[in-house]
Amino acid sequence: MLREPVGLFFTLIFPPLLVAILGTIFGNDPTPQFDGKGFVDATLPAMSSLVVAIMGILILPATQLQLRESGALARLRATPLKSWTYVAADVTVHFLVGMTGVVLALIVGMLMFDVRAQGSVLLVLVAGACGLIAFLALGYTLAAVYPSAAAATGIGNGVMIVLMITSGAFIPMEALPSGVRHATQFSPLRHLVELMQGL
């Protein structure tokens, strides 16, 4: 993964950049729309949760399939390296990179927009870590289902757009049609956003 600049961009640069851009556009002055909180105050945990989803839906499946298509995984099987050692190392790398992206997004919000923590930052990080573990498991499942890295990227981008729009991170759930709101009950990102916003 460390050799994939696109993956690193979307996990380490895109989230804090998104916080900076949206925070600059909408500001962080308290508004009734967010119950007296600023835009960044209200949405920062949700925006940081996007790192978790991007890692599981986009980055991990594409990375695994690229390794499979290049023959790297087959060559690894021919070495004395145990399978569980590779899996443990791969999970660890993706987990650490994902959590770094979450932390960077939070730091940008706190430093640039003076975000006032509504609860425990530690709990937000714990929730992000639990969500990341779940999304990594989903990512490995998708990697086993997708036929190719190109399919993983194409389908993953479409899925991510839908998940972002219906997560409640940017568009209030009340603004969505009732049928869409009902369907989002099955969205893992919506539940992660609600968890992190509530901490």
PLM features: what roles do these ranges have?
Residues 1, 5, 72, 179-199:
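Hydrophobic alpha-helical segments of integral membrane proteins
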Residues 13, 21-29, 146-186, 190:
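Transmembrane helix segments
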Residues 63, 106-107, 141, 191, ...:
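A residue-level signal for alpha-helical anchor/packing sites in multi-pass solute transporters
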Residues 20, 106-111, 129, 140-141, ...:
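Alpha-helical transmembrane segments of multipass membrane proteins
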Residues 123-146, 164-167:
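Hydrophobic alpha-helical transmembrane segments of polytopic membrane proteins
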Residues 1-73, 84, 89-102, 109, ...:
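Transmembrane helix-boundary elements of multi-pass transport/secretion proteins
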Residues 75-84, 145:
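Short helix-to-coil transition segments within interhelical loops
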Residues 67, 111, 144-145, 199:
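Helix-to-coil boundary motifs at intracellular loop junctions of multi-pass secondary transporters
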